[in-house]
């Protein structure tokens, strides 16, 4: 690619799936290739995330405008990068240096990531290869390329659904599936069965930000698990054998003054009591993964959680690690968690996203490529999951087009490359 340069960069403000502004960028190369990328946005965010630059003008999209980030792309970033030779890591590094802050608060992680991913997409066209192959090539993960086992968010709570439960996500994992099409079908059939179960119990079937049902359940945080198990059986699958359950507790959202304040019950639990609770859930339900089971600042609690349950299930750090290699390395050194959620916009560039995945994989941590609750129709994470061989993907429910876009892209990738196998990190369970 040494003869190809960046010819033009242009950004604009568009809307995400919540109707909030976000950044879209186009990158044009000297050979005529072009790439476009859209950046998502989170609702429950870790304190260590790279900064999403917002305008703060209450008279313009209630302060959520991204015109400053757009201007940063169209002026500062464009001026720096136009006529530069195409090299993903070098270009990402130039933007990081131009920003000059630890959390990308000068230019905005939303500005940098939009250009980073748009450049990657333009580069794939210049190299005449699929996006996932380009990602694998620059990451050195070609031998790991595979289709990811989906985590399908069928019931929403917490910050994604007005606190109808304290826990944020209840997900299906179709662990008996042998290919991605079958995995998606199993999830869709169970999702539709769950709608029938909810209607029979007179629960509403409106959906939350990520497309999962969000009823105000009466049985507390455990009831969605009962409902999901019933739906799995209703869809003619075997609970725990065909389809298992994953949960995102998002506990940083209700961690206050050293305790876990449950809004639904009014109780406050200690770290030890939360761990006991999870242990009880494992005995009753086929749970294979718990994300953010304790808060991002509760490192001592996380050590105990990992010690007690780390050999029984996947313990995922999201707010804990925020796709940051420094925090991940700390977790590895201190034996905290055994898996990391990968969100490109938490760190703000493709190169740094790759670094987090590679470090995790080398250290024996599971990796899960993830969307955000405020999404777009951009399907880049499907390609990142395949190219980096993350083994798992978390991209919402079986409703809402911005979620389905990623599932559809995975099926297209599978059709185009029949040699890619569906990864199943839980096959041995």
Where are these regions (language model features)?
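Short beta-strand elements
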Residues: 13, 23-31, 37-41, 152-174, ...
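Active-site-proximal beta-alpha loop/turn segments in soluble metabolic enzymes
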Residues: 169-180, 205-221, 253-264
């Amino acid at each position: 690619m040494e003869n190809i340069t960046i010819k033009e960069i242009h950004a604009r403000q568009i809307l995400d799936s919540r109707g909030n502004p976000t950044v879209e960028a186009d990158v044009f190369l000297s050979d005529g290739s072009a790439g476009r990328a859209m950046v998502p946005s989170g609702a429950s965010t870790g304190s260590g995330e790279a900064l999403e630059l917002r305008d703060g003008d209450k008279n313009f999209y209630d302060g959520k405008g991204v015109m400053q980030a757009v201007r940063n792309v169209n002026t500062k970033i464009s001026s720096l990068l136009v006529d530069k030779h195409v090299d993903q890591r070098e270009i990402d590094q130039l933007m990081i240096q131009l920003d000059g802050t630890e959390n990308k608060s000068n230019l905005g992680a939303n500005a940098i990531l939009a250009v980073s991913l748009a450049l990657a997409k333009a580069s794939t066209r210049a190299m005449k290869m699929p996006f996932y192959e380009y990602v694998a090539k620059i990451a050195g993960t070609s031998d790991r390329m595979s289709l990811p086992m989906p985590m399908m968010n069928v019931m929403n709570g917490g910050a994604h659904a007005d606190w109808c439960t304290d826990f944020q996500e209840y997900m299906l994992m179709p662990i008996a599936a042998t290919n991605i099409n079958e995995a998606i079908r199993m999830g869709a059939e169970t999702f539709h069965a769950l709608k029938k179960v909810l209607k029979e119990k007179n629960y509403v079937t409106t959906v939350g930000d990520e497309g999962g049902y969000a009823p105000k359940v009466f049985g507390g945080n455990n009831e969605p698990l009962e409902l999901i198990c019933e739906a799995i059986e209703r869809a003619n699958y075997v609970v725990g054998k065909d389809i298992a359950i994953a949960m995102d507790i998002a506990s940083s959202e209700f961690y206050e003054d050293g305790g876990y304040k449950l809004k639904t019950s009014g109780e406050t639990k200690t770290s030890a009591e939360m761990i006991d609770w999870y242990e009880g859930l494992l005995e009753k339900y086929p749970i294979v993964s718990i994300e953010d089971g304790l808060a991002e600042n509760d490192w001592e609690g996380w050590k105990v959680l990992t010690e007690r349950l780390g050999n029984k299930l996947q313990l995922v750090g999201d707010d804990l690690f925020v796709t940051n290699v420094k925090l991940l390395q700390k977790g590895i050194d201190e034996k905290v968690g055994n898996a990391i959620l990968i969100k490109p916009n938490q760190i703000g560039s493709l190169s740094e996203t790759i670094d987090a995945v590679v470090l995790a994989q080398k250290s024996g941590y599971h990796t899960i490529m993830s969307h955000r609750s405020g999404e777009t129709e951009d399907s880049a994470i499907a390609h990142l999951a395949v190219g980096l061989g993350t083994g798992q993907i978390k991209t919402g429910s079986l409703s809402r087009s911005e979620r389905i876009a990623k599932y559809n892209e995975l099926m297209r990738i599978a059709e185009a490359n029949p040699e890619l196998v569906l990864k199943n990190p839980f096959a041995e369970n």
